[in-house]
Amino acid sequence: MKKLQGAHLRKPVTPDLLMTPSDQGDVDLDVDFAAHRGNWTGKLDFLLSCIGYCVGLGNVWRFPYRAYTNGGGAFLVPYFLMLAICGIPLFFLELSLGQFSSLGPLAVWKISPLFKGAGAAMLLIVGLVAIYYNMIIAYVLFYLFASLTSDLPWEHCGNWWNTELCLEHRVSKDGNGALPLNLTCTVSPSEEYWSRYVLHIQGSQGIGSPGEIRWNLCLCLLLAWVIVFLCILKGVKSSGKVVYFTATFPYLILLMLLVRGVTLPGAWKGIQFYLTPQFHHLLSSKVWIEAALQIFYSLGVGFGGLLTFASYNTFHQNIYRDTFIVTLGNAITSILAGFAIFSVLGYMSQELGVPVDQVAKAGPGLAFVVYPQAMTMLPLSPFWSFLFFFMLLTLGLDSQFAFLETIVTAVTDEFPYYLRPKKAVFSGLICVAMYLMGLILTTDGGMYWLVLLDDYSASFGLMVVVITTCLAVTRVYGIQRFCRDIHMMLGFKPGLYFRACWLFLSPATLLALMVYSIVKYQPSEYGSYRFPPWAELLGILMGLLSCLMIPAGMLVAVLREEGSLWERLQQASRPAMDWGPSLEENRTGMYVATLAGSQSPKPLMVHMRKYGGITSFENTAIEVDREIAEEEESMM
């Protein structure tokens, strides 16, 4: 193949014999709507949005705990290896799909309509996650407001929500040093504040009897949705500006917490506990699985957020560079967050006279119990508490922007003539609907429903979606064709590393993750509460529903075609006639035009050699010889 460096930036010459006036009208209409779809106002908008999307709550409350329980510093070996095998390639693949087509998670499956069900599965998953994720933001807002006092309300016992088991955990000392406390039969004020005041979980008998709605949580959830709506009101035009603050300010707060943490007595004890390498853990398959899971969920692959953000890029945005900036930045942020968390936990363990592993927790237990308790031991505790929860707020909002933008973009791209002019109204309706669906999370037993959603909404179903996407693009659409599409955008083809990962390593890793999660399946639980069988069944069905959308989409695509079953499968697997770059100026090479005069017009790349004695197709951008054309035809 002859490569013309930089030529892809010029507008192609469209042969008149290949386009009818009606076709030209359609193209103009498409270009008009592509222009109205909008783009980021600057390249930094996209980069910061991706950073904000990936760097979320999991970096603070999941990575540090996973690191210290899976070998400390040795955990970084499988972590970065899985980042290279799975994280970076899948991240780049999703960005490439979105930027090349300028389409959301549903319409992007013009690449192969047979797999459009994977896009619907993405929307189901991201919708369920968005419902409970905003409830977590509501909890953060609750604690943020509670920090605006001279004394933190979870600092002491003696409040109406405390029980006889409440004990202010302060170390006892004698002349020879600290005497460790027996914490087995006691409960900290911060834990009772979280469970008995914020959640009021004692008012529920379980997931089947959620109890009453908590008006304070209900208002916090409403505020969270109002904030999200105002920030996505004008799509990426507004959210792209908000992230200049929400994606950068957390780093300032994290730095302040880190500096404060490492200067506390006992801090290095916690850091040593966090990073001391235990290389024998590397012999355990569990450690490698945990590393892959952390990478998979941390980068947000498969939720559609990356694809959506990239769809608003200009056609030649350097997403190759952006991929490495975001993925490596996400990893470094996770490690730094571990220093900030464990330095404070080391100080806390020294103050309590207990080992670090007795105070370290993961998930909400770290954010809403352990760390708030540690804040009460610091001078100016309300100030540090406010900073911590404000950091969590900004981290959570960035991810929520992506979830909502994914849903809105996907649906408006499917019905652009009706919804795109009313995108703000549609966004508001989505927020209202999700707020109403999330009200059950504000009840006394709302935490049980949140745990159920968290455990099943984005579990094995998400892995099935990503595996399907990877195989559909590389095996059905074709790895060579996909690499040439990337060449049109970036001026170079992905090398052997990306091809090997897309074809073999990434799908195999995800398949291993899915099998492991099924084999090691454990029923959901929250503390000592075990979920009833019907709740477990509901969760499993929730995960299966996203998987079933893929074969359901295949069935619909096949029924829309004509001919035998094999012919229908072939036709449904082929790219749609209008697949390719959205703007005419970027439709070069095989995408330069579609054939007219045929009873069933199909992409030019398939039929170019079959009409008018043309044996190759060429324009000012790319020249493709007879061998490549035959390869394209054989792929179909």
UniProtKB/Swiss-Prot annotation:
* Membrane topology classification: Multi-pass membrane protein
This entry carries the following GO cellular component terms, namely: membrane; plasma membrane; synapse; synaptic membrane
Where is this protein chiefly located?
membrane
Q: Where is this gene product found?
A: Synaptic cell membrane
Q: Which residues carry this modification: Phosphothreonine?
A: T20, T588
| CDD domains documented for this protein | SLC6sbd_PROT
Q: In which tissues is it expressed?
A: Brain specific (at protein level). Highly expressed in hippocampus, corpus striatum and temporal cortex. Also expressed in frontal cortex, occipital cortex and, at lower levels, in cerebellum and parietal cortex (at protein level).
Q: Which GO terms describe its molecular function?
A: L-proline transmembrane transporter activity; proline:sodium symporter activity
Q: Which UniProt keywords apply?
A: Amino-acid transport, Cell membrane, Glycoprotein, Membrane, Neurotransmitter transport, Phosphoprotein, Symport, Synapse, Transmembrane, Transmembrane helix, Transport
What Pfam families does the database record attribute to this sequence?
A: SNF
Q: Which residues lie on this side of the membrane: Extracellular?
A: 138-214
Q: What does this protein do?
A: Brain specific sodium (and chloride)-dependent proline transporter. Terminates the action of proline by its high affinity sodium-dependent reuptake into presynaptic terminals.
Query: What protein is this chain from?
Result: Sodium-dependent proline transporter
